[in-house]
Amino acid sequence: MAALSKSIPHSCYEIGHTWNPSCFGSYLQITQGAMEESFKIYAPLYLVAAILRRKNLDYYVHKLLPELLQSTSFLTANGSLYIAFFCILRKLLGRFYFWTPGFGAALPASYAAILIERKSRRGLLTIYMANQATEALFRMGVTRGYIKPIRHGEVLLFCITSALYMFFFRCRDGLKGFAFSALKFIVGKEEIPAHALLPENMYVKAEQKSKEHRGLSRNSLKRLMDIICKHGPRHRCCKHYEDNCISYCIKGFIRMFSIGYLIQCCLRIPSTFRHLFTKPSRLLSLFYNKENFQLGAFLGSFVSIYKGTSCFLRWVRNLDDELHALVAGFLAGISMMFYKSTTISMYLASKLVETMYFKGIEAGKCPYFPHADSVIYAVSTAVCFHAAVMEVQNLRPSYWKFLQRLTKGRFALMNRKALDVFDSEASKNFNNFVPKLDPRFCIVKPELPLDFS
């Protein structure tokens, strides 16, 4: 708490924009760099999204560019307004306090910036930044000894989140939209309660028709596989009519393992092909990389454990119950041991909280707060900026790289050595970096002792 009462008399040039003594000149440089990088980030993102959603020609002609420029303006404003409020606060207060270089300057800048962005994107941005801020605050608590980290905590969080997600998935009107479609794709329609409304004889008839239509072209191996899959233990409550319980789980594992393996391969293609001509041997690493198999094992085991547990509980209890999804979902979450990811756990947990909150609003049990997404985004972004200034070691490395890219590397040029007086180890990861300042624009000369009032 003693650090909160301290202050330093340095100017905004000596602490913040050390590369340029002019506040306005620094603002223009940050704006230019942020605009270039924002456009590079959003241009391919919007183009790929439009292609995947199969937008018509009218969208490309009339809507794509305005939406792209709006998002670019939002991200540019978030960076440029931060340096603007950084200088404004210094001039208004006359000194720098613990909260002003990071949180104080980023809060109004982030709130003003998010109002520029389209409303349809604010919710997603809020969840993303809330995840970043929560992780940063957690690391701050661990650093200060306020919080004791739990071993495999991200796996435990994923287990709890998975259990609740699968329970809502099994309940009628529990999940809607993308979340429902995604889980339906992952675990299959056989686990949807509405699927039980379709009588078994419909599947038998469809199966017989497909046999008659394709019987001539099937080989003996295919026929043997059908016999193995369909002639085995299957509980009367199980809706996987074309498989027994064992083959149902095995097929689920193979399918999602293949999808996870291919996804990770596709993600590695750009970095691999950059070195195709200089190091051709790296092409083999695209297919034999450890992470490819880890993601495949994670997705495959998640589905097989969930399906296997669901079938087991139907056999044991002799009924199909939505509560089975809680147990099956929790056990399936252990599959994250193959592919540990705090990002995935935090994101899904945040989306779950959002889902439950909106369900509470629909039920009339939770109050609705207008502009809550904008406020949460502003506070979360301010926390992340504060961590980036005062204790970057507690910020997620990927977000620090993003800030560096957005500011063309200028975020690392801040005089964090002078901020060490606030006891946050601001210069810890910067090798005691001290910027070269023009003495003509300095309030505090390097050789003079500082007065911390």
Curated annotation (Swiss-Prot):
Q: Which GO terms describe its biological process?
A: regulation of mitochondrial fission
Q: How does it sit in the membrane?
A: Multi-pass membrane protein
Annotated Gene Ontology cellular component terms:
mitochondrial membrane; mitochondrion; peroxisomal membrane
Localization terms from the record? Mitochondrion membrane; Peroxisome membrane
Predominantly, its location class is mitochondrion
- Which cysteines pair up through disulfides? They are none
Q: Which UniProt keywords apply?
A: Membrane, Mitochondrion, Peroxisome, Transmembrane, Transmembrane helix
Q: Which segments does the entry list as coiled coil? A: none
The membrane-spanning stretches of this chain are 68-88, 96-116, 149-169, 293-313, 326-346
Looking at the keywords, is Membrane present? yes
Q: According to the lineage, what is the superkingdom?
A: Eukaryota
Pfam families xrefs: TMEM135_C_rich
Which PANTHER family would you find in this protein's record? TRANSMEMBRANE PROTEIN 135, TRANSMEMBRANE PROTEIN 135-RELATED
Q: What does it do?
A: Involved in mitochondrial metabolism by regulating the balance between mitochondrial fusion and fission. May act as a regulator of mitochondrial fission that promotes DNM1L-dependent fission through activation of DNM1L. May be involved in peroxisome organization.
Q: Which family does it belong to?
A: Belongs to the TMEM135 family.
Name of protein? Transmembrane protein 135
Q: Which source organism?
A: Xenopus laevis
